[in-house]
């Protein structure tokens, strides 16, 4: 048997294809017409276009490989038994197998080259002397998490890919690593065959979908799976090649396992011939034991292909990631008083995730300064959001916040603690609504609503309420056109279903909430005939791969984490708080009254280990329920409050309140003793938060630290690793690790679900 192998980028050279262009003039003319330039001049004339530029390299190699193949078949009168290609060369292998003709293949390659040629800021390097497992271990050990394995060229030649700066860091690491014979940076502009090609892949996927492919006449070995292409997954597999590892070693081992196999390199150079020679010397063949049940084996093989496509980047909704320019379907929620800091938001954005700056409890100036800082750090297309917490008592503060967000062109808002849609949210949506060229209504000001109740979800899944539109029209705050367009779209682009979580919580259970909310979403989309899907995310309790996997299996289009981010370097809270959080376990939280909604009895989940806050906060709420005023408390209780809880007199507290609260509130307190008591008790909640954030030594036991069990689970997960110490925890690295290990876990669980019933079915062995 014989396999024809086709080289990829790196094999190009000036002068290649000489003689072939004249021999196949009709195809050369066809190529010139498709490309818009002379393919012969590109390949043979030094003063013409640069054949080493990706945009030109790929079409040039494809054409030369294709013409070389036609000449080989004419000369030998024989077609191959198998075909394979390295990266770009795979298109020639598919052409040889009859999947498409010369013209179609060239159009695909032209588009691929254009997309990859636009990628900048990336780098690649070959590591000689280490196995893939050893290379991966070195990357993990030195926290080079932004680097991927791009090519497995031979057992001892591994190509890595990632941001150029990260590749430069890796050079120093590998050159000082035992057994590394050579670290060779490649002359490329992009991080090819890595997660950083995901956006280009999505565009290519849409492009390739318009083409029709014919049945394969011979098996073509896929770079992605190191196994033959499946006809019904041909387009998907070809697209996946762009951001996945080229498994060349295992591809050749698979072919070696077919029996006596001859390899012939078709195209310029002998790069693949050299790689195959080394693989034969350094590795053994792979084979499959004959299958007992072809139907079952085919099903299992298909499942394996599906599983192999599970990566950190593939989890969640592709449309969601595309809309927000994300690599990962991973968000980090806003945390009170800027604990979800500008540093946190920037770090996540640069890593292909999205964070929300926590505005609760901050002044407008503090929020605006943070927005300017974030915008100054991030470039176009890097996503960030601002958290907007509903203020039931002071809606005017929401008005001012929306004015600020609109003024600073903040286009993504996380709406938290809203019990329904409000006029300020309607106004925010109105100022970004328009029709695109296709006539679809789109909104540049996006809302992601965090919800935990179906009735709240329904209000955000519905168009803006008519009474609010009329009110805003009457106040000249929106236009007639804006009102008309708002009637066509939901109030929220996406909703995030929040199960039991740190901070404000309804104590919901994800297993019950997610199915109910996704069904409601489907019902509302049908009711209002929305054209664009509303995505449903999951939050609350997510701190381990198991929890994240459960969320995605329940249908989450994205996940949102909270508590685990509070115990990181980027969190804007005190080291003392982080020290306490690092020690907590899943049972170390409790529920306490929410300071901002004290009178209603709303709850927040807080840390209880090492502090008295939850017990003291609950005591205050108990007193508020039992008594009508501070004066009704006995002397002993008053003394306890002043000495143990407040560390100051009731009189001093009230003076402080009078300085900071609106005059209307103080006037009401003077007339209503119950309201005055509520203001005094609520002072303790602000006080306890400030103690924690500042790390005050004055009264550590009064620290109010919003937190859920997810952090306890996270602590157990990373116990014994570098991440056990919070000083080694960075939000971006945590996010990537969580998503990566979730993908691995999901892959393993899928494998176990589809494990063959016969030991001889589809088992890879060495021979």
From Swiss-Prot:
Pathway: Antibiotic biosynthesis; bacillaene biosynthesis. It catalyses: holo-[ACP] + malonyl-CoA = malonyl-[ACP] + CoA. Its main location: cytoplasm. Residues 1-312 are annotated as: Acyl transferase. GO terms for biological process: antibiotic biosynthetic process; fatty acid biosynthetic process. Pfam families: Acyl_transf_1 (PF00698), FabD_helical_ins (PF21607), NMO (PF03060). It comes from the Bacteria. SUPFAM superfamilies: FabD/lysophospholipase-like (SSF52151), FMN-linked oxidoreductases (SSF51395), Probable ACP-binding domain of malonyl-CoA ACP transacylase (SSF55048). The keyword Acyltransferase applies. One of its GO terms (cellular component) is cytosol. The active site is at residues 87, 193. Keywords: Acyltransferase, Antibiotic biosynthesis, Cytoplasm, Transferase. NCBIfam families: fabD, pfaD_fam. Probably involved in some intermediate steps for the synthesis of the antibiotic polyketide bacillaene which is involved in secondary metabolism. Probably has an acyl transferase activity and could also have a flavin mononucleotide-dependent oxidoreductase activity. This is Polyketide biosynthesis protein PksE. It comes from Bacillus subtilis (strain 168).
């Amino acid at each position: 048997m014989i396999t024809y192998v086709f080289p990829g980028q790196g094999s190009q050279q000036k002068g290649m294809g000489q003689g072939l262009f004249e021999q196949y003039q009709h195809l050369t003319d066809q190529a010139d017409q498709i490309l818009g330039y002379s393919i012969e001049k590109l390949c043979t004339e030094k003063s013409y276009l640069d054949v080493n530029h990706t945009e030109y390299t790929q079409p040039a190699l494809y054409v030369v490989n294709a013409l070389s193949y036609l000449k080989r078949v004419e000369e030998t009168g024989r077609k191959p038994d198998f075909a394979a290609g390295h990266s770009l060369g795979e298109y020639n292998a598919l052409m040889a197998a009859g999947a498409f003709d010369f013209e179609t293949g060239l159009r695909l390659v032209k588009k691929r080259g254009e997309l990859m040629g636009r990628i900048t800021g990336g780098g690649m390097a070959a590591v000689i002397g280490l196995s893939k497992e050893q290379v991966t271990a070195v990357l993990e050990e030195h926290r080079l998490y932004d680097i991927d394995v791009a090519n497995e060229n031979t057992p001892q030649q591994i190509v890595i890919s990632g941001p150029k700066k990260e590749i430069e860091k890796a050079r120093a690491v590998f050159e000082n690593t035992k057994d590394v014979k050579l670290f060779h940076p490649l002359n490329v502009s992009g991080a090819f065959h890595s997660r950083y090609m995901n956006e280009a892949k999505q565009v290519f996927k849409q492009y390739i979908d318009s083409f029709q492919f014919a049945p394969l006449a011979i098996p073509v070995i896929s770079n992605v799976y190191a196994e033959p292409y499946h006809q019904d997954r041909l387009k998907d597999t070809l697209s996946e090649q762009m951001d996945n590892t080229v498994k060349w070693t295992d591809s050749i081992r698979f072919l070696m396992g077919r029996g006596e196999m001859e390899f012939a390199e078709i195209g310029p150079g002998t790069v693949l011939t050299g790689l195959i020679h080394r693989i034969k010397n350094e590795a053994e063949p792979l084979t499959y034991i004959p299958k007992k049940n072809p139907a079952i084996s085919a099903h299992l093989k298909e499942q394996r292909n599906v599983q192999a496509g599970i990566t950190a980047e593939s989890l969640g909704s592709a449309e969601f990631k595309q809309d927000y320019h994300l690599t990962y379907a991973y968000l980090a929620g806003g945390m009170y008083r800027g604990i979800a800091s500008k540093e946190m938001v920037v770090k996540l954005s640069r890593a292909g995730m999205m964070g929300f700056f926590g505005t609760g409890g901050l002044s407008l100036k503090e929020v605006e300064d943070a927005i300017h800082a974030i915008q100054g750090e991030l470039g176009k297309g890097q996503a960030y959001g601002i958290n907007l917490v509903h203020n039931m008592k002071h809606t005017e503060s929401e008005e001012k916040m929306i004015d600020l967000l609109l003024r600073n062109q903040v286009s993504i808002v996380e709406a938290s603690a809203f019990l329904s849609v409000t006029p300020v949210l309607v106004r925010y949506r109105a100022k970004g609504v328009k029709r695109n060229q296709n006539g679809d209504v789109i909104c540049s000001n996006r809302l992601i609503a965090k919800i935990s109740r179906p009735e709240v979800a329904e209000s955000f899944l519905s168009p803006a309420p008519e009474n609010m539109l009329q009110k805003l029209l009457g106040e000249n705050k929106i236009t007639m056109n804006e009102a008309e367009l708002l009637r066509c779209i939901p109030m929220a682009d996406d909703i995030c279903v929040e199960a039991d979580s740190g901070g404000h919580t309804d104590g919901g259970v994800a297993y019950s909430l997610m199915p109910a909310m996704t069904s409601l979403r489907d019902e509302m989309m049908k009711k209002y005939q929305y054209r664009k899907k509303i995505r449903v995310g999951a939050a609350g309790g997510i701190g381990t791969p198991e929890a994240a996997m459960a969320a995605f299996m329940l249908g989450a289009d994205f996940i949102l984490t909270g508590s685990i981010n509070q115990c990181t370097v980027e969190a804007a809270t005190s080291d003392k708080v982080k020290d306490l959080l690092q020690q907590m376990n899943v049972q170390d939280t409790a529920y306490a009254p929410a300071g901002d909604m004290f009178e209603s009895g709303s709850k927040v989940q807080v840390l209880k280990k090492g502090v008295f806050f939850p017990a003291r906060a609950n005591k205050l709420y108990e007193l508020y329920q039992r008594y009508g005023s501070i004066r009704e408390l006995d002397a002993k209780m008053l003394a306890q409050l002043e000495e143990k809880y407040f560390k100051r007199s009731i009189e001093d507290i009230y003076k402080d309140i009078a300085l900071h609260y609106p005059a209307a509130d103080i006037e009401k307190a003077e007339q209503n003793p119950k309201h005055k008591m509520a203001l005094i008790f609520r002072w303790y909640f602000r006080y306890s938060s400030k103690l924690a954030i500042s790390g005050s030594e004055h009264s550590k036991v009064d620290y109010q630290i919003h937190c859920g069990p997810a952090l306890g689970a996270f602590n157990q997960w990373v116990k014994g690793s570098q991440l056990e110490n919070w000083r080694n925890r960075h939000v971006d690295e945590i996010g990537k690790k969580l998503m990566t290990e979730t993908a691995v876990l999901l892959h393993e669980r899928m494998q176990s679900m589809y494990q063959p019933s016969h030991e001889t079915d589809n088992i890879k062995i060495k021979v």
